């Protein structure tokens, strides 16, 4: 039975083979602080910090405005062009760690309704 398409703008794809989990300890303190600021701005519980940080680490290793040439994904949470509008200032938010985090938070809670659910999905599929 084929996998059910759950989100119209993201095609079903297989997980990454040979994937190794990245440690959150490599994310700079300034980026972790930006995540906490974004969580406050988006009224997200502090209890979700570790799950959000973990997702960010797997997606970008905490590198602001990072680009993925293969998918055109961008930023700390690797938003696709269709999600750029989730950032407070759209595409202009890239380069601002707090605003990139806000866009990622909005994507995660809009699609998965919790950071824990998004992390669980990521751990199973190696993408979100």
Language model region names:
Residues 90-99:
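A short, structured beta-strand-centered segment in the mid-to-C-terminal lobe
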Residues 60-67, 86, 127-128:
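Secretory-pathway/luminal and periplasmic proteins that interact with or process carbohydrate-rich
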Residues 69-88:
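Substrate-binding/active-site groove segments that recognize
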Residues 30, 34, 38-41, 50, ...:
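Catalytic cores of secreted/periplasmic lytic hydrolases that degrade extracellular macromolecules
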Residues 49, 73, 98:
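Glycine-rich phosphate-binding loop at the start of an alpha helix
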Residues 47-63, 101-108, 118-123:
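Short, functionally critical alpha-helical segments immediately adjacent to catalytic or ligand/cofactor-binding
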């Amino acid at each position: 039975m084929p996998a059910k398409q759950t989100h119209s703008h993201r095609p079903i794809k297989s997980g990454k083979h040979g994937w190794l989990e990245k440690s959150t300890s490599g994310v700079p303190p300034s980026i972790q602080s930006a995540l906490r600021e974004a969580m406050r701005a988006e009224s997200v519980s502090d209890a979700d910090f570790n799950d959000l940080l973990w997702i960010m680490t797997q997606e970008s290793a905490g590198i602001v405005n990072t680009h993925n040439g293969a998918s055109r994904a961008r930023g700390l949470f690797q938003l696709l062009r269709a999600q750029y509008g989730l950032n407070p200032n759209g595409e202009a938010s890239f380069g601002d760690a707090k605003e990139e985090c806000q866009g990622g938070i909005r994507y995660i809670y809009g699609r998965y309704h919790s950071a824990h659910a998004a992390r669980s999905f990521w751990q199973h599929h190696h993408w979100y």
